């Protein structure tokens, strides 16, 4: 999988301790639509892309006694839906792990419904939808158990 980074123990993006995997690509729709340079992850745009074997990521996750979920985010996971599905296939089938997997997307649900359908067979998937819109008050999301930056953003278990 092509990634920009991994945080083995993340406590801010989901209610459970997570491995946070930074995806590699984004079209920066939040900036384009707001007309502002507002991307919370713009530093990642210049980070190098690295390729890491799915098995290495899964083993790293499973060997950590703290983490209880995996979160994909940082840039746009839906830009790598094929790679994420391949990862999930190994995670669920080969390693028999049913832990929560969360995807933070800037897309609205109706924009990625085909991609959502690809995720359903893997079970226990949560997707955070909605672009970052600057100058909004953060709100608590009950599904994720964390505050989201814009009031149009929400998570759904699919």
Where are these regions (language model features)?
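Short, low-complexity, polar/charged sequence segments that are solvent-exposed and flexible
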Residues: 22-24, 41, 89-92, 121-122, ...
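Canonical Radical SAM [4Fe-4S] cluster-binding loop centered on the CxxxCxxC motif
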Residues: 11-52
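Canonical radical SAM enzyme core domain
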Residues: 44-59, 78-121
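Auxiliary Fe-S-binding modules of radical SAM enzymes
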Residues: 2, 6-15, 62-65, 95-158
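Short glycine-rich anion-binding loops that position phosphate/pyrophosphate groups of nucleotides
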Residues: 26, 77, 132-133
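Short, conserved beta-strand edge motifs with alternating hydrophobic and charged residues
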Residues: 22, 69-74, 102-104
């Amino acid at each position: 999988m092509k990634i920009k980074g991994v945080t083995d123990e993340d406590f801010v993006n989901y209610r459970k301790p997570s491995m946070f995997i930074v995806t590699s690509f984004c079209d920066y729709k939040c900036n384009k639509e707001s007309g502002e340079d507002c991307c919370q992850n713009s530093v990642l745009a210049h980070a190098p892309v690295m390729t890491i074997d799915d098995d290495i990521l899964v083993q790293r996750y499973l060997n950590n006694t703290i983490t209880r979920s995996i979160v994909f985010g940082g840039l746009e996971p839906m830009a790598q839906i094929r790679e994420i599905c391949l990862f999930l296939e190994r995670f669920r089938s080969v390693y028999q792990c049913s832990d929560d997997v969360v995807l933070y997307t800037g897309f609205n649900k109706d924009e990625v419904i085909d991609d959502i359908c690809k995720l359903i067979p893997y079970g226990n998937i949560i997707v955070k939808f909605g672009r970052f819109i600057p100058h909004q008050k953060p709100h608590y999301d009950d599904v994720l158990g964390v505050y989201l930056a814009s009031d149009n953003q929400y998570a759904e278990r699919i």
